[in-house]
Swiss-Prot record:
This is Sulfate transport system permease protein CysT. The keyword Cell membrane applies. GO terms for cellular component: plasma membrane. It comes from the Bacteria. InterPro entries: CysT_permease, MetI-like, MetI-like_sf, Sulph_transpt2. Residues 63-266 form the ABC transmembrane type-1 domain. The gene is cysT.
Amino acid sequence: MSLRLPSLSFTWLTRLSWSWRFTWVYLTLILFIPIIALFLKSASLPLGRIWELATQPVAVAAYEVTFGLSLAAAALNGVFGVIIAWVLTRYDFPGKKLFDSFIDLPFALPTAVAGLTLATVYSDKGWIGQFIAPFGVQIAFTRWGVLLAMVFISLPFVVRTVEPLLLELEVEAEEAAASLGASPSETFWRVILPPILPGVLAGVAQGFSRAVGEFGSVVIISGNLPFDDLIAPVLIFERLEQYDYAGATVIGSVLLLFSLVILFVINALQNWSSRYNG
């Protein structure tokens, strides 16, 4: 008598739903393959050449400007985004809907137009720049201009992630804390912040990612000077203009790698906050 192993009527792949398969095919074509291709292109170069291109002084300076200002912009929006979300959810005032719609303007506005607008307002002869220039303060075509552009394009992320969380909070909890003698600052730190902290960190992470990759607005409002306000995305574009595809690929890989590491850290903090408050 011969033994027959039971045959599988369906393979593992056929048991998967079409939505699952479509999701993975879509992500593979749009996200995974381009990222892997970038790393493979860099890995095709000799290791010494990769190190040389990645650690050029101008590239290192561009990394510092890019990540330093992106983190600063994300932190600023983390603070002011919460304040704006608080105002939108806790107060009624004339023109509130119009004010709320303006928050999403950086999403819809082309980045080049955003850069042109900021340069028009904050240049030495701009609407605001002309009043601060006599005091020796220059925003446009400096690192301050880069920071301003990054703050502008990443502002909506924190506001839109925190706003629904604030709407879910019960006002009675805040009133109870106040009735028990808690000060407004104590109420914020102990009652309001813990449940919205994961949303704040999520918005900060999204805003940081957006700021790191920003090009259109920064290239207009900054001076794009090496070792001063030149950011990595603009440096990559300059390398491509010089037909230095190897340099552009390596710098892009470094930028992507460091961004992934920082996002991993922020997401880890977000998960920790969710478990701590859950």
